[in-house]
Amino acid sequence: MSQTHRILLLNGPNLNMLGAREPKHYGSISLASIEEKIQTLATQHNVKVECFQANSEEKLINKIHESFQQVDFILINPAAYTHTSVALRDALLAVSIPFVEIHLSNVHKREPFRHHSYFSDVAEGVICGLGAKGYEFAFLFAIDYLAKK
């Protein structure tokens, strides 16, 4: 890439507990380890990545708003807000930044209430069920997407 692109990695509620929280569904890797891997990839691809996690819908929305005209791509794991937050969806649409929706677990193999997403129909793509590797795949997709712009 000739210019340095900026990517925002957003993680929603309870993802700060990765590694300890329900490893059957989410694996044993910590969020810090996932972020470290993405930062390593970013360095290799000459991309700047900012990582942000919040348990609060308001903080996530504010971070999205702050990204307007500052960020080229968003990688988001909205966690439980996937199934409930029209406000987060509206924030993403308001800033018009392309994004990929990420889920560690395969939400379609879980409880029925997890099968609906307020984001997937407006996302560039959705990655679910691939564990922490899903973040890497989403990052590489973003790199490819931005290279084609």
UniProtKB/Swiss-Prot annotation:
* Record's catalysed reaction(s): 3-dehydroquinate = 3-dehydroshikimate + H2O
Question: What domain of life is recorded for the organism?
Answer: Bacteria
Any GO BP: chorismate biosynthetic process
Chain residues that bind substrate: N77, H83, D90, L104, S105, R114
| Alphabetic keyword roster | Amino-acid biosynthesis, Aromatic amino acid biosynthesis, Lyase
Kindly indicate whether the keyword Cytoplasm belongs to this entry: no
Which residues make up the annotated site Transition state stabilizer?
A: R21
Q: Which Pfam families match?
A: DHquinase_II
Cross-referenced InterPro entries = DHquinase_II (IPR001874), DHquinase_II_CS (IPR018509), DHquinase_II_sf (IPR036441)
- Identify the metabolic or biological route this protein is part of: Metabolic intermediate biosynthesis; chorismate biosynthesis; chorismate from D-erythrose 4-phosphate and phosphoenolpyruvate: step 3/7
By sequence similarity, the record places it as follows: Belongs to the type-II 3-dehydroquinase family.
Please give the function described in this protein's UniProt entry. Answer: Catalyzes a trans-dehydration via an enolate intermediate.
The UniProt subunit note reads as follows:
Homododecamer.
Q: What is this protein called?
A: 3-dehydroquinate dehydratase
Q: Which organism is it from?
A: Haemophilus influenzae (strain 86-028NP)
Lineage, please?
Bacteria, Pseudomonadati, Pseudomonadota, Gammaproteobacteria, Pasteurellales
